[in-house]
């Protein structure tokens, strides 16, 4: 499905499809994606069966899901150490996401270690240490490449190491170089860009573009409980072709982290809630 489409006047659309297009627009889905989905539905061989809202939404979910990269949740098998890094802007929810991930794998009897590189945020160190205490995990601090190397060595027996990085601006090249240096020492298998779901489409796009050269290969959306508009998240997931790994609700640890199934985010757009659309 392309990201550009000629506008179809709403008044020319069947009633149910016009209502669906309006909902997608109100939910901040990129307008060109909305129009592309509308045109796909208009030309779909089964369009006569989509006159009711239910079947129409179901087909729209399917179309949008087919446009996204397959989801890729983290797999920890215990035979080879897995290292994941969470990157993103300040306030995206990286530390809480790191703790939720840690709790998720602790519950699977995995040996989990946390490493924090956040030296700047007020209360950041106390927050991750508090999460570590809740989960009975020690937290290593690594503010330099040498400290990261030492922390990785100290936690060499872990099944999973989660590196919670400091929030930085996607256009701050100096801070990005520092981040890259730390990541070179950590050598993560996965780099998740953490995006807060209430964030606007333009800001999400800027973050994805800005962190691209860091090696991001997954998107992790947080705070889905703080909005009922998931169009921006759906839009960037489609446009970027980057897999979505996890969705999170709330700041509760443990809990409220969902490994994305193929249609999770698409369904959430229409039902306006994450609950019931994915399994943790």
Regions found by a protein language model. Give the residues of each.
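NTP-binding/hydrolysis catalytic cores, primarily Walker-type P-loop NTPases
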Residues: 1, 235-280
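Primarily NTPase-proximal linker/entry elements flanking Walker-type ATP/GTP-binding cores
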Residues: 1-111, 115-120, 130-144
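Residue-level signature of catalytic and energy-coupling elements of molecular machines
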Residues: 30, 95, 128, 164, ...
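Inter-motif core of Ras-like GTPase G domains
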Residues: 110-113, 153-162, 174-199
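Conserved beta-strand/loop subsegment of P-loop NTPase cores
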Residues: 113, 188-195, 212-227, 231-254
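Conserved nucleotide-binding/hydrolysis micro-motifs of P-loop NTPases
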Residues: 119-122, 146-147, 167-170, 197-201, ...
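Conserved ATPase-coupling elements of RecA-like P-loop NTPase cores
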Residues: 125-126, 170-176, 203-204, 230-232
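Conserved nucleotide-sensing/catalytic segment adjacent to the nucleotide-binding pocket
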Residues: 132-167
């Amino acid at each position: 499905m392309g990201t550009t489409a000629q506008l179809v006047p709403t008044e020319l659309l069947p009633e149910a499809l016009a209502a669906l297009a309006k909902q997608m627009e109100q939910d901040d889905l990129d307008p060109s994606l909305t129009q592309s989905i509308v045109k796909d539905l208009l030309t779909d061989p089964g369009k006569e069966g989509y006159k009711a809202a239910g079947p129409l939404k179901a087909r729209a979910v399917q179309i949008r899901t087919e446009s996204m990269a397959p989801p890729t949740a983290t797999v920890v098998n215990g035979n080879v150490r897995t290292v994941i890094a969470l990157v993103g802007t300040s306030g995206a929810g990286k530390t809480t996401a790191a703790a939720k991930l840690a709790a998720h794998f602790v519950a699977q009897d995995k040996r989990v270690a946390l490493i924090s590189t956040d030296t700047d945020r007020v209360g950041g160190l106390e927050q991750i240490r508090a999460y570590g205490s809740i989960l009975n995990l020690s937290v290593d601090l690594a503010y330099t490449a040498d400290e990261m190397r030492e922390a990785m060595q100290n936690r060499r027996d872990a099944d999973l190491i989660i590196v919670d990085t400091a929030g930085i601006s996607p256009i701050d090249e100096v801070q990005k170089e520092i981040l890259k240096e730390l990541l070179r020492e950590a050598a993560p298998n996965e780099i998740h860009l953490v995006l807060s779901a209430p964030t606007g489409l333009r800001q999400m796009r800027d973050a994805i573009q800005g962190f691209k050269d860091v090696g991001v290969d997954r998107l992790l959306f947080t705070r889905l409980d703080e909005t009922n508009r998931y169009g921006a998240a759906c839009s960037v997931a489609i446009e970027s072709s980057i897999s979505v790994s996890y969705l999170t609700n709330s700041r509760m640890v443990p809990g409220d982290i969902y490994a994305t199934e193929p249609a999770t985010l698409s369904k959430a757009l229409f039902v306006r809630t994450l609950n019931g659309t994915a399994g943790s």
